[in-house]
């Protein structure tokens, strides 16, 4: 039996309609819940969290630790599909004593989706690109990840080129011996450095694949 939960009444009501339409009312129980709050310890051996950002995914897991803190090594499962900040989710799993068993990357209508399967266990600390893009996907030379990296590289180069090209002119226009002008230039320089570092990480990862 499955338990489906949502913090909002509207989506939960629509989910209930869908469950009834497909004749699964006896197999899926719906609960109004903020994260995992309404799920009891030992009630589920697999927890699926999908359709939200990585920060919120981590918050739900942290606040719902009563569900998983006593799980056995290699037995119960987390299935996570964060829409952003995947690196934070991977760091969280490592810090909380989980091991990533495998990952999958999918694409639909130009959007990319990550699915992470994890269980209790020890995860060896990884490199920055392992947390950013997924060690399992890099190791498998996943073709969807490669396409994603190519897209990210192209977009990052374009943004970086625009910022760098206009940097001298922007400095001239913005810096008027004022604190506000210096702050704007400092922020732009930090953004350029951030993009350059990200581009280098993409290139390094692509070379591995």
Spans of features found by a protein language model:
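Conserved S-adenosyl-L-methionine
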Residues: 1
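S-adenosyl-L-methionine
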Residues: 5-45
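Class I S-adenosyl-L-methionine
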Residues: 37-43, 55-209
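Glycine-rich, N-terminal phosphate-binding loop of Rossmann-like dinucleotide-binding domains
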Residues: 51-52
